[in-house]
Amino acid sequence: MAKCLYCYKELNGNERDFHKACSKKIFGTLEAPILPYTHNNLNDLARQVIRSQTTLTGVQAKLSLDINKGSKNEPGRFTIVGLWGRYILKPQTERFGNLPELEDLTMHLAEIAKIRVVPHSLIRFEDGELCYITRRIDRTNEGRKLAMEDMCQLSEKLTEQKYKGSYEQIAKLVLRYSSAPKLD
C-alpha cells in the first residue's frame, strides 16, 4: 500500500505521494508541485548554481527551490532559484545511502517527542528517487529574509569554521544567551 511522503499514512486509491491536506501543509497547495529534475542532471544544475555564486552553506549537498504556480488545472513546478528560495532540497548522496529518508525520519521522531521542527517531507524526483525537502523558516511567503541567528553567529565564528566546534562550546553559549538554559 502506498504511503504519504509527508505523514507516512496510507494514501487513498486516487492519491499519489501526498494526501491533499498534507500537500497543503507543506506546499500550500492541494496538489504537490512537480519536481522536474533527476539525479543525473543535478551535477549540471549544481555547476550553474555555483557559477551564479548563490550556494547554501553546510555539509550536505542542497539546492534552494521555489514554486512556480501552475494554471488552474496544472500543478505548480519547483525551480532552482539560488539563495532566495522558500524550500531547501537535499537529494540522495553517493557517499551515504538513504540520507534523505533518515533525515525525514529523524524529524518525525523529534515531532513525536514534542520537539518543534521545520515543515519537512520526502518528495520524488521525476525519476522516482526520493529527496528530503524542507520549507525555509527564515523567509516570508514573499521571499524576504527574516533575521535568525545560529550557533555559528552566536559563537562569533566565521562561516568557514561553522562545523569546527564541540557540544561543550554549544552548551556554554546556551548558558550565556538563554533565559531558560535547562529547557533549551
Model-derived features with residue positions:
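Generic detector of well-ordered alpha-helical segments enriched in charged/polar residues
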Residues: 23-27, 31, 35, 43, ...
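A sequence-composition feature that detects small, non-aromatic residues
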Residues: 2, 21, 32, 46, ...
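Sequence-level detector for tyrosine residue identity
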Residues: 6-8, 37, 87, 132, ...
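Regulatory N- and C-terminal appendages and interdomain linkers associated
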Residues: 1-43
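Conserved ATP-binding subdomain of kinase catalytic cores across diverse folds
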Residues: 42-164
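Helix-hairpin-helix/helix-loop-helix acidic hairpins
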Residues: 157-184
